[in-house]
């Protein structure tokens, strides 16, 4: 499964950032930047029929899952940036931290019981890593040997709070094999790392 190049991913987020800075988007958006290479390699291993559970920061995931650029941009412009889904592609998101982890584990259990060889890929950020739902789901998946992978996209931010501010000891559990982590440095236009412009939102009818 591979539908976008690195250049296309970056250009798309720059386009969304432009609309944001022009005041066209009086809604919350969460842009990505700096994690393109990792995601492209990861999505190359995904197959049709696999399930993807994304987060509020989902634009890269949606494009790599095959949602067309024009369709995704239209959804973002109408305020659905955090709620993108496509049931035909088994692609779902949620704006609530770690809320999809247990759902992903349940889908993986169903796939195993039905004899399917498809997998579930569940994304979360380093802020969601601190939520109990995540650990419950990981223990269930690992204990039942389910076809589910949890991908922690660690941009060292929970809203605007760094790991050292949230966890001064930097203590982290050793994760089982069903969890992989991508530590990356956020680059523009990643939300929280942009131009810090004062934006006047345009009236929406």
Map each language-model feature to its residues:
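Active-site-facing substrate-recognition patch
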Residues: 1
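Generic recognition of cysteine residues
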Residues: 4, 101-102, 122, 148, ...
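Conserved N-terminal diphosphate/IPP-binding helix and adjacent helical/loop segment
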Residues: 5-19
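Cofactor-binding active-site loop characterized by glycine-rich and histidine/acidic residues
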Residues: 14-17, 24-144, 162, 168-169
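Thiamine diphosphate
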Residues: 144-205
């Amino acid at each position: 499964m591979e539908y976008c190049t690195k250049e296309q991913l970056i250009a798309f987020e720059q386009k969304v950032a432009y609309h944001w800075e022009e005041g066209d988007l009086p809604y919350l958006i969460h842009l990505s930047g700096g994690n393109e290479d990792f995601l492209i390699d990861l999505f190359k291993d995904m197959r049709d029929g696999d399930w993807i559970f994304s987060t509020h920061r989902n634009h890269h995931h949606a494009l790599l899952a095959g949602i067309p650029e024009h369709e995704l941009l239209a959804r973002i412009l109408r305020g659905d940036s955090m709620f993108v889904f496509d049931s035909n592609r088994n692609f779902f998101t949620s704006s609530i931290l770690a809320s999809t982890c247990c759902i992903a584990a349940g889908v993986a259990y169903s796939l195993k019981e039905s004899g399917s060889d498809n997998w579930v890929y569940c994304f979360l950020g380093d802020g969601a890593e601190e939520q109990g739902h995540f650990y419950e789901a990981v223990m269930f998946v690992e204990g039942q040997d389910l076809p589910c992978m949890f991908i922690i996209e660690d941009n060292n931010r929970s809203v605007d709070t760094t790991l050292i501010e949230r966890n001064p000891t930097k203590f982290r559990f050793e994760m089982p094999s069903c969890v992989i982590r991508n530590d990356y440095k956020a680059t523009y236009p990643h939300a929280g790392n942009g131009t810090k412009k004062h934006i006047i939102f345009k009236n929406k009818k």
